[in-house]
Amino acid sequence: MKKFFIALMASVALVGCGKDDNNDTGIQEGAFPKKITSTYPNSNRSTVTTYNIQNGKLLSATITEYENGVQTGTAHIIKAEYLGDRITQMKYGQPSAENYAIKDYTYDGQGRVIKETRVEPHRTTENGDSYTQEYRYEGGQLTKIIRQNPTTNWINGERKKVNRHSESVLAYSGSDIIVNETVTYRDGNGAVVTGTSTYTETTTYTVAGGNLIKKIEGERTTEYKYDSNINPMPLNALLRTTMPDYFLNEDYSKNNLIEEVDSYTDYQGKLVKNIKSIELTYNSKGYPTMKKTFRQRGSETKTLQMIEEIEY
């Protein structure tokens, strides 16, 4: 499901941070994958994801997992429903399955998503991922994200159900986007629960040329490098507005990611670097048809983690 979500959301068009542009409403022929086969060299597992595209709309995806070439379990199906050219609902899995989920989108008069709700009717608070997320805009830019999800917290030596409430305020300064996220724990009436903590975290993103090139989060810095070819996913405007903060994620940048370096200082004061590198093979249009992902953690040996074969 995660692989589908990444590919699905990556079709958001990158036309400027937080800007809305509805010149295109469909999927460009030959620019969105019809099939992705992922294999993991360090295991005997693989995953095949196929996409059902009709009349320029992505209607569904089917994710099938294999072990030693034999299918394991039931294929996972995700369906999208539309009102005109806008996605209004996504359904994950079978209604009777434990991991079944429904996601709904609400739009304002300008066609921007202002509310996103995900419900997992068969999951419990402890292992579920139900939430409500609201988006606020000013001057054509995304300026605030409000998210609330059920969780549990230890209060006076007892585990109690509460709502985790976060407000992320986005401030734009040149190529930097500073996000201050304040988290509180609230009851069903929206009041802050006594005995819980409130904290604020700051993350600074640097975006240049349509690419996220740096993220600073606390003591951790992540830097990104890209090739010079156009990432085909962002060419598709179909799902443009369903992820208003797409520009804060490297997977949705204008060009194709080829390196990610995560740096931090460990408890001994030593600088540690974890490196993810990607080798790409392209078709005649310059779109990736194969991705080989390597990882090197600190001083460990660089190893091949995953191979993706992409068919358009």
Where are the predicted features?
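C-terminal motif of bacterial Sec signal peptides marking the signal peptidase cleavage site
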Residues: 14-16
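Positively charged n-region of N-terminal signal peptides that target proteins for export
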Residues: 1-4, 18-19
